[in-house]
Amino acid sequence: MKMRKILVASAFIILSMATASAQLTIPKEYMPEVHGTIRGKYEHQTTNGMQRFQVRNARVSLDGKVLPVIAYKAEIDLSDEGSIKMLDAYARFTPNDTWNVTLGQMRVPFTIDAHRSPHQQYFANRSFIAKQVGNVRDVGATGAFSLKEGLPLKLEGGLFNGSGLTNQKEWHSTLNYSVKLQLMPWENYNLTLSTQKIHPDKTSVYMYDIGTYYEFSNWHIEVEYLYKTYAKSSFDNVHAFNAFVNYDLFIKKGL
């Protein structure tokens, strides 16, 4: 009888351990994914002979899901020209493939080139549109609607504080907005229209952007134009233009 009790107790302990282990097992679809990009560069100024090395980016991101319809992302740059910057920190509700809602800190939906991560950029430096005009990250909420059949499209729009990433305690009488529409009428072609209103100080700034690109074989052809105007004609209008042609040379895996 005593031996039977011991065996029953042992079996209960093993069953409890197996149950606990099963409870601690994280389903594959909920396992977080870690991504990273390290980009170093060397620059030499031919006019005065000055030169320097630089770690332009050292980005690390963590993203995943906590529920089938709830996703998250956190991204930090440990060396943005020597400075540490928190880039993305948001949660996203995606009930289906048609629409989603995002809340947190993110890149504002605007332009084509500004949305490229460092590992997706075609050149050592970003374009003027991506770096000086359309490079905006802010805290707010966005909604996105997409269609994959008929006329494929993606429409994104959002409201943002307008005070950047560090002044999140400020209260605002008005919010910034940004809207971006992507049309994909045929395969490998994209037409993007976007507009944005920001209020950096006491003057509202309005920006309008149109861009398109087409990919075929090894080629990527892209053109983008941005118009920036200030309320009450406070400053001169700004015109920004970006165009390039890229040809990919594929190499065998392992080389």
Task: Give residue ranges: language-model regions.
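A short hydrophobic/aromatic micro-motif that marks alpha-helical segments and, especially, helix-coil
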Residues: T19-A20, S83, L165, D201, ...
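Compositionally biased regions
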Residues: A11, M17, A22, V179, ...
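Single-residue recognition of alpha-helix boundary sites
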Residues: L15-S16, H115, K228
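Detector for outer-membrane/organellar transmembrane beta-barrel domains
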Residues: P27, H172, Q182-L255
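Outer membrane beta-barrel
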Residues: L24-G164, S173-L175, L181-N190, F244-N246
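Cleavable N-terminal export/targeting peptides
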Residues: M1-P27
